[in-house]
């Protein structure tokens, strides 16, 4: 969601309506770009309607791992620069370790750092398969 999509009851209702109209019975993961969604009330409401929060690594956003509805989805945009970032191996390992320590049925790490995606993806793949 764009950073202009702030936590309000109207926006929560919009998400609920969208999920119902789209007939999405399964879990839905939404990436919020405004920190107003990261509070106990909104998290409880999202979990109640079976919408999970996408955890993100990006500039100016909280680096929190969300586990809603037994699902962790972590998107790596770039720690210091959106999309144009090459993660150091120790950064990826730290994120992998944090995700691994969490209990969830579904765990996923998605690279969205266009310029560093290939070497970072190779590192992730090698360490996940080993």
Question: Where are these predicted regions, by residue range?
Answer:
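Residues lining hydrophobic/aromatic ligand-binding pockets adjacent to catalytic sites
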Residues: 1-130
């Amino acid at each position: 969601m764009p950073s202009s999509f702030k936590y309000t009851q109207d926006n929560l209702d919009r998400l609920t309506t969208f999920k119902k109209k789209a007939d999405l019975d399964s879990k839905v993961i939404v990436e919020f770009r405004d920190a107003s969604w990261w509070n106990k009330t909104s998290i409880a409401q999202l979990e109640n309607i079976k919408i999970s929060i996408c955890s993100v690594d990006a500039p100016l956003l909280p680096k929190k791992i969300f586990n809603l509805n037994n699902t962790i989805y972590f998107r790596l945009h770039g720690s210091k620069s959106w999309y144009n970032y090459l993660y150091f191996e120790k950064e990826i390992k730290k994120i992998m370790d944090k995700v691994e320590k969490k209990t969830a049925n579904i765990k996923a790490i998605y690279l969205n750092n266009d310029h560093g995606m290939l070497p970072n993806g190779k590192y992730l793949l090698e360490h996940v398969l080993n």
